[in-house]
């Protein structure tokens, strides 16, 4: 008997078939206590603070995926914070979990809190078990089921292309120079989303034949998310065009930028969309609501609910963005005596923040032990 205790998934899951064969030859059983895998992701981000310099680092840690291949797109289109980027899958990493199943062992989930969001009861996820089969068998199953193959191809295509979120906050000074490259990136993203939708559309008829709740959830969720983000891209493009044609300066004396934020009057905003985009918005909501209802208390439903709460249309809102070194700040145009109370408070808070950052940098440089962050 072998007992493994780990907080990572490892980076050699491709050797699982070889390991299983060896264990069977020697009639060995493996039990593992390990992490919960992030949903459709290989890594999670862990915050580590150097005890001597107090410097904090966000370090990637291998903890997934829960399946042989990533079956859902990350769709890293908009920066919405770490809590949205990672979700619990409710299962262990594919390689370690399959290793135990093939040899009569157990995989004990240890949730160390590294993944934000809701936890899922394994009893509720039994209908959604990953395909714990060999690599060859997994590929064969995908080829025999057009819907599964379409999901895998659409997820792979978007994951390879959408690597960085679009900037939604632009400095008001010289905003037209920033709008051009932002619009170019936006159009490229919209094209990638369209490509994913074309792939899924080709398997629409196959949806009627698919019996796996897991793959049906994948298909409907991915289609809904692609459509929703396509509408958001259209809305953002309209804002960029309007600001480019008629650039404006923030009225708030503490602001120096414009941020594309979600419109609270979502229904009104969607009714103002052109017919094609309005239909996309309708289909997006239908797919996402179906997932939230038909697959309740699962990662798919959690992501669908999150998408439904994220408005499909944007509007400009005044914001503050630290300019590049040497750039003017909103309160630099007037002497202290002429600043408003709000500007004075903002100026003091900003300068205090910069002093703290400077002190931390100096402390790190003068530390007796100059170490790189560890590889977790």
Regions found by a protein language model. Give the residues of each.
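Pro/Ala/Gly-rich low-complexity, hydrophilic intrinsically disordered segments
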Residues: 56-64, 113-165, 306-368, 373-376
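Loop/turn elements at helix/coil->beta-strand transitions in domains of secreted/extracellular proteins
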Residues: 1, 24-31, 103-106, 297
């Amino acid at each position: 008997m072998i007992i493994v205790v780990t907080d990572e998934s490892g980076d050699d899951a491709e050797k699982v078939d070889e390991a299983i064969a060896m264990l069977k030859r020697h009639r060995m059983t493996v039990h593992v206590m390990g992490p919960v895998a992030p949903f459709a992701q290989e890594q999670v981000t862990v915050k580590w603070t150097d005890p001597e310099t107090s410097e904090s680092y966000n370090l990637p840690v291998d903890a997934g995926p829960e399946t042989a291949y990533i079956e859902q797109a990350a769709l890293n289109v908009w920066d919405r914070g770490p809590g949205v980027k990672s979700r619990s899958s409710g299962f262990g990493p594919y390689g370690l979990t399959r290793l135990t199943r093939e040899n009569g062992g157990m995989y004990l989930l240890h949730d160390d809190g590294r993944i934000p969001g809701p936890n899922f009861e394994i009893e509720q996820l039994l209908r959604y078990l990953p395909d714990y089969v060999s690599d060859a068998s997994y590929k064969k199953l995908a080829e025999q089921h057009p819907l599964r193959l379409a999901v895998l191809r659409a997820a792979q295509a978007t994951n390879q292309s959408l690597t960085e979120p679009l900037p939604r906050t632009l400095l008001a000074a010289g905003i037209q120079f920033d709008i051009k490259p932002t619009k170019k990136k936006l159009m490229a993203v919209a094209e990638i989303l369209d490509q994913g939708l074309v792939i899924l559309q080709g398997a629409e008829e196959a949806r009627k034949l698919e019996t796996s709740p897991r793959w049906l959830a994948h298909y409907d969720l991915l289609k809904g998310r692609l459509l929703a983000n396509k509408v958001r891209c259209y809305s953002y493009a309209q804002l960029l065009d309007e600001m480019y044609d008629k650039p404006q300066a923030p009225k708030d004396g503490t602001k120096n930028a414009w941020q594309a934020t979600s419109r609270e009057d979502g229904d009104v905003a969607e009714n103002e969309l052109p017919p094609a985009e309005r239909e996309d918005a309708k289909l997006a909501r239908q797919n996402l609501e179906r997932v939230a209802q038909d697959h309740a208390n699962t990662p798919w439903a959690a992501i669908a609910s999150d998408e439904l709460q994220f408005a499909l249309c944007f509007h400009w809102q005044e914001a503050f963005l630290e300019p590049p070194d040497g750039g003017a700040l909103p309160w630099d145009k007037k002497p202290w005596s002429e600043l408003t109370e709000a500007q004075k408070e903002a100026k003091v808070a900003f300068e205090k923040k910069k002093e703290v950052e400077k002190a931390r940098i100096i402390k790190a440089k003068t530390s007796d032990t100059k170490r790189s962050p560890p590889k977790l």
